[in-house]
A protein has these predicted regions:
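Extracellular beta-strand elements of beta-rich domains used
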Residues: 266, 286, 303-307, 638-639
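Short beta-strand-plus-loop segments that form exposed binding edges in beta-rich domains
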Residues: 287-295, 624-630
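Extracellular carbohydrate-recognition regions
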Residues: 147-164
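Short carbohydrate-recognition loop motifs
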Residues: 168-194
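Beta-sheet repeat architectures centered on beta-propellers
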Residues: 1-125, 408-416, 420-424, 430-650
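Hydrophobic or amphipathic alpha-helical targeting/insertion segments
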Residues: 116-147
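Extracellular ligand-binding interfaces
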Residues: 192-276, 295-300, 573-592
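Beta-propeller and closely related beta-pinwheel folds
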Residues: 59, 63-70, 109-110, 311-462, ...
Length: 650
């Protein structure tokens, strides 16, 4: 923005012009010393090509797309055809997926912690994790623990169940229902016949190791009264179609059972063998038998049975990927730990496939992201780069190396890491926004230091995303004294402009691709999933936009000025904008000076020429252009102020 002050030959008539390009917010100095091109304040406005205009709003992404409870995750899974499925989670321990018309359960009964999930798609699965519940994978159909192979989930799609049983929609751990079996004193046997025989040996994918008898079979079972369960004749069985060759385990070997839910975990080697050669690779029938003691009645509901490696990647705070390998960071064994799965086999993890990054340096891993041929690992007070050589090596002996990037900047939040223009990585520290270009970490937020520096709480909640259509990176954060992300700071990397925004509570930001379009999705504290850069309101609430020009004075700030009028150009539109002004005779008065309305301009009126009468006398003047009705508008510079310098100094 060019600030030109023209003084007439008489030495009294004064014309001040604000010309493009405008450069966005500069909150580092007082309004009287804002550098050329910057603004002391701008809210809910964009500056494409340096021309100010009201920002585009947000709309509900899909009818009914509101997640219940306090949400802790918004993630996207992509099918092989690139079709997205959206996942969400909340603090009541529920994980959902969006069917296109409703949120539907994937898992229930997980931790009720406020810990946020981290997510990353690796190959054909979306991997999600938090440090309480562990690591899970979604394949487009179901959500299973990492390392698990599906056996049966008791959902309605499994239609080949035989025997007396019913769908239990009350006692459920996975999906929409469990499989309930009732015994009234005699054994009740219920069988499931998979469409294709189950191979409970072959590992998942082309490179994962095979399952052995040292691995485990797990399932959930809800028992209403364990004292009435005959554990000797209640069993699970996996075998051939004729029930002549099978592996069987009675409830006496399921571990300690209690009333309510029990998560049974048993070694394959613990199953008794019937017949000469039952084979784990061709399981054609899965049977559940429930028996009550004497003439008693007992109810048992089974849910979510799977085979899983005995050793799986531990629960961690952050997941990313590298060379098609799942990377998990900051785990339950150490906050500096990095774990890595076998290439192209995210389920397959070895206890030796782990190493620390800058261990015992006093800070923990906050986040990380793949970057070309490296993974950038951000700790509280430092950043590091790790590389790997996998060719010519055998897992878990991949060769990893690490090198420090900087100890001047750390990180505040994994979810603040955003890939921007030129494949640069941007993220928040506790008091800065920095950029990594593959060589060094540089601070980029100098112009808005006072805006960022007061942050003291909820640093972990800072979230970032990219609005490609506007050449912008977005970060939502919690200002001092608030408990939700009520502020947004946007960076227009084409104009190198910082653009604040208020009016939304964006607890998460997420980039997605749908039908070839890049989307920036967000979720509010009320669980509403919004598409940013869409519509003219913030989710039906009018957008209040404002633009504050720098303070101006005559050539001699000690001389009094009579401010006659301002001329504000604008594009034809609907609605109105209001031009306000405030005055001061000394810089110390600026902080408490209040705005007065000069005039409201009708944007569609052909007679409206944008001339605004001021008629005030002071040494300093500041103009503000504001719109509170949400009507879209564009300012067409220059903005001009006409004044006359008074002969008297007071």
């Amino acid at each position: 923005m060019g600030l030109n002050v023209d003084l007439a030959e008489n030495g009294l008539d004064l014309t001040i012009r604000f010309s493009p390009p405008f450069r966005g917010l500069y909150s580092r100095s007082t309004p009287t010393s804002v550098p050329d091109g910057f603004l002391p304040d701008i809210v809910n406005m964009d500056i494409p090509s340096g021309i100010p205009e009201s920002m585009i709003g947000s709309t509900l992404f899909a009818t009914g797309m509101t997640l219940t409870g306090t949400h802790t995750m918004l993630a996207t899974y992509y099918s092989a055809a690139g079709v997205p499925t959206y996942l969400g989670a909340n603090t009541t321990g529920e994980v959902y997926y969006w069917t296109g018309s409703a949120w539907t359960y994937l898992l229930r009964g997980l931790s009720t912690s406020t810990l946020w999930w981290s997510d990353e798609q690796v190959g054909n699965v979306l991997v999600i994790t938090n440090k309480n519940d562990g690591i899970f994978k979604y394949d487009g159909t179901r959500l299973l623990p990492i390392g698990a192979k599906h056996i049966c989930d008791m959902e309605s799609a499994e239609v080949t169940w035989a025997g007396t049983n019913s769908a239990d929609t009350v006692n459920v751990k996975q999906g929409l229902q469990g499989r309930k079996i009732t015994s009234t004193g005699a054994a009740v046997v219920v069988t499931f016949t998979p469409a294709t025989a189950l191979d409970l040996i072959d590992g998942i994918g082309p490179t994962a190791r095979d399952y052995t008898t040292a691995d485990r079979i797990k399932f959930w079972v809800y028992i209403d009264d364990t004292t009435k369960l005959d554990t000797a004749t209640t069993y699970i069985r996996l075998g051939n179609a004729g029930d002549t060759l099978y592996f069987q385990l009675t409830a006496a070997n399921w571990g300690s059972l209690a009333n309510g839910w029990n998560h049974v975990s048993v070694l394959k080697s613990a199953f008794a063998i019937t017949g000469v050669t039952p084979v784990w690779s061709t399981i054609a029938k899965v049977s559940f038998a429930v028996d009550a003691t004497g003439a008693n009645t007992v109810n048992a509901t089974f849910d979510d049975m799977y085979l899983v490696y005995a050793s799986t990647m531990p629960a961690c705070s952050v997941v990313t990927s590298f060379k098609n390998s799942l990377i998990g960071m900051n785990d339950t064994s150490g906050t500096s730990n990095v774990n890595f799965a076998r290439v192209s086999a995210p389920d397959d993890w070895d206890v030796l496939a782990t190493f620390p990054v800058a261990e015992n340096n006093g800070d923990a891993i906050v986040g990380g992201k793949k970057y070309y041929d490296q993974v950038v690992v951000v700790k509280d007070q430092s950043a590091h780069s790790i590389y790997a050589t996998v060719s010519g090596t055998t897992y878990p002996a991949y060769r990893f190396s690490q090198s420090p990037i900087t100890s001047a900047y750390g990180g505040a939040s994994h979810r603040s890491i955003v890939e921007g223009d030129g494949a640069k990585l941007y993220w928040w520290t506790a008091s800065d926004i920095v950029m990594y270009d593959g060589t060094s970490v540089q601070k980029v937020s100098t112009e808005v230091d006072p805006t960022i520096a007061p942050l003291a709480t909820r640093l972990w909640s800072i979230v970032g995303g990219r609005l490609r259509a506007k050449n912008q990176l977005w970060w939502a954060y919690t200002p001092v004294g608030a408990t939700t992300n009520t502020k947004v700071l946007r960076y227009d990397y084409a104009q190198q402009a910082w653009l604040p925004s208020t009016g939304q509570t964006l607890e998460n930001l997420m980039n997605a691709t749908s039908s070839g379009s890049d989307l920036l999705l967000s979720i509010t504290s009320a669980g509403r999933v919004l598409q940013q850069g869409s519509g003219t309101t913030f989710d039906t609430t009018a957008i209040s936009s404002s633009l504050d020009l720098p303070w101006v004075s005559g050539p001699d700030p000690e001389r009094m000025v009579r401010w006659h009028e301002a001329a504000v150009g604008f594009a034809d539109s609907t609605g109105t904008i209001t031009v306000k002004y405030r005055t001061a005779d000394h810089p110390r008065e600026m902080a408490t000076a209040s705005y007065s309305t000069a005039q409201t301009l009708t944007l569609s009126s052909s007679s409206e020429k944008g001339r605004v009468f001021i008629g005030a006398r002071s040494r300093w003047l500041q103009l503000q252009i504001i719109n509170v009705t949400g009507a879209a508008f564009q300012i067409l510079p220059p903005v001009t102020i006409k004044a006359i310098i008074l002969k008297q100094r007071y």
